[in-house]
Amino acid sequence: MFKIEKIFFWKNAHTFHQCTVHIVFVPKYRRRVLQGKVATRIRELFFECCELNSWFIHEMEVMPDHVHLLLQFPPDVSIAKAAMFLKGGSSRKLRQEFPELEEFLWGDSFWQDGYFVETVGRMNQSVMRNYIKNQKIERTMTSHGL
């Protein structure tokens, strides 16, 4: 892995790459359940999944009703596969560890179907990092009418 101006380029046998996406996951019914211990645990689960798969989280912000990730992975991993691993593994674990969530999230899944994703080139990666970092600040200002 090479680091150039806070941008990571990975080298495999036949590729030199930097595949980064901004991805947003939302709990089912957009319930505000990503708070306290659940928010802490979701961060841990996402970092564990990425470490296990040799992916890299540049930035993450857990809001009460959604999660922003700036995620980098190799080109042989599809966005759909990365989303499936992150959402599937965390959903199962969260439902096991926090059975009280069943009151808010009926059915067998924690996450809403689908996700938002956009690719992030190296020219606008720092802009996206700041956007994700400042989610809580912007949300607080908006909710207070500022």
Residue ranges and their predicted role:
Residues M1-L146:
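Basic nucleic-acid-binding interfaces
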